[in-house]
Amino acid sequence: MTKEFHHVTVLLHETIDMLDVKPDGIYVDATLGGAGHSEYLLSKLSEKGHLYAFDQDQNAIDNAQKRLAPYIEKGMVTFIKDNFRHLQARLRETGVQEIDGICYDLGVSSPQLDQRERGFSYKKDAPLDMRMNQDASLTAYEVVNNYDYHDLVRIFFKYGEDKFSKQIARKIEQAREVKPIETTTELAEIIKLVKPAKELKKKGHPAKQIFQAIRIEVNDELGAADESIQQAMDMLALDGRISVITFHSLEDRLTKQLFKEASTVEVPKGLPFIPDDLKPKMELVSRKPILPSAEELEANNRSHSAKLRVVRKIHK
């Protein structure tokens, strides 16, 4: 049975407007989710334009088929159920060699967080899962119960940036010797036991960073984003654009670095001109990230950490 996807789209107009949509163009929504960005983008296309929408969650696609029905009837939408790390291969399978723009809304979607049984949330008791693609084999349960101490410390530091990573990994080791850690609540309670009283008084849930780290590991989120954004830059037509929304420092750092590398070039001093093969491919559309408006922040609590970065293709 398909579950409803209740999702408030973050930075909706900014993300799509910054793509400078060409009515007859070919566009990609790399993270379909609740289909808010897709719907707004489609409203800017003529019937000659086309949108390719990626999501690895069948539930998202099922719901988007209802929301986007008027555009589907006109043959303007193609859904691709896959991880966006396969962007280039899947688009080429359909005959697409170039795209005019693409948007990314990175991280976990609100409906996935809100569906208790998906096991993403530390606020709701559920089996440890955290798979965005429910056909994937690696689950949060596997990570928590089967990764050794050193691997747990590595992902907690790298993806959660939690200063208590070693202590939490040790406590998990001790707990699972007694019995497997099976639920989100069990894991959250173990994390709470490690955190000092002053940490527990701080704003935000004490398990937030560790849950983020496990989720990123289960879905290889940063690896997938890195591969996909690089493929997107290769596939962009001249003057095409990429919009990327991030929600935490790791995603933003990755996006910022990829865009910086593609938009700058180091050449020896004294060269009278820059050879074509050394010219940067991309140009930053905005030097600083675009942030949600005060109105959006008030209306949607989940938009607080959102940042939007945009680049434009200026050279093949």
From Swiss-Prot:
Species per Swiss-Prot/TrEMBL record:
Streptococcus pneumoniae (strain CGSP14)
**Family to which the UniProt record says this protein belongs:** Belongs to the methyltransferase superfamily. RsmH family.
What does this protein's UniProt record list under function?
A: Specifically methylates the N4 position of cytidine in position 1402 (C1402) of 16S rRNA.
Chief localisation class: cytoplasm
Task: Print the keywords alphabetically.
Answer: Cytoplasm, Methyltransferase, rRNA processing, S-adenosyl-L-methionine, Transferase
Enzyme Commission designation: 2.1.1.199
Q: A GO molecular function for this record?
A: rRNA (cytosine-N4-)-methyltransferase activity
Question: What name is this protein filed under?
Answer: Ribosomal RNA small subunit methyltransferase H
Q: Which Pfam families match?
A: Methyltransf_5
Give binding positions for S-adenosyl-L-methionine: 35-37, 55, 84, 105, 112
Q: What class of enzyme is it?
A: transferase
Q: Which GO terms describe its cellular component?
A: cytoplasm
The reaction(s) annotated as catalysed by this protein in its Swiss-Prot or TrEMBL entry are: cytidine(1402) in 16S rRNA + S-adenosyl-L-methionine = N(4)-methylcytidine(1402) in 16S rRNA + S-adenosyl-L-homocysteine + H(+)
Q: Which GO terms describe its biological process?
A: rRNA base methylation
Q: Where in the cell is it found?
A: Cytoplasm
